[in-house]
Amino acid sequence: LGVHIPHGTTIFPGTGSPACAAWPTVIKPVRSKVALHDETLSLSVRICANATQRDEALADLLPLSPVLEQDYFRGRGFGVEVLFEHGEPRWWFAHERIHELPITGGASSYRRSIDVPGNLRKATLDLLVHLRWHGVAMVEFKMSDDGDYRLMEINPRLWGSLPLAVASGVNFPLAML
């Protein structure tokens, strides 16, 4: 499809971990929340600058969840939110992440609505049409200043920045009725 993605591999508990190809590397738990005994734990993305940090991240996370290890891509975070009906786009919205926690990349804590960048619109359209998507999705990207981008993930659900879309006049929940 020509959609750019960071190189990555999934590491499962008890399988050992392959050697890291480049630094920094990103360790993403497959699950953001896990139940442990009587509590719910939040798992977060770790950006590792060296083997020691990577080993610590894997030791912390692998007992709780498989992880995705990806090459780090420097850029700003963007979300392209869509509502598709039987493989056809009906509603579009986009936001830029102004601030993330941690600041080097993670959950967004401050965003602004933007016009959907052309290259991200094309990548989103190519992906979701190919998948014959039906319903909502938030397609997350990182984009460098020169317009090069990487797909980070597709969230097949309503997203944390939904209130920004609604406040901007793009009411996805109403459109889903």
Where are these regions (language model features)?
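A conserved helix-loop-beta module that forms one wall/lid of the active-site cleft
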Residues: 1-45
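Short acidic/His/Gly/Ser-rich catalytic and metal-binding motifs that mark active-site loops
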Residues: 34-37, 100-104
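Active-site "cap" helix and flanking loop/linker of ATP-utilizing ligase/carboxylase catalytic domains
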Residues: 115-139, 145, 156-177
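Active-site ExK catalytic segment of metal-dependent nucleases
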Residues: 28, 153-155
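Short secondary-structure junction motifs
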Residues: 5, 66, 134-138
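Phosphate-binding site of ATP-dependent enzymes
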Residues: 46-103, 112-125, 142-150, 158
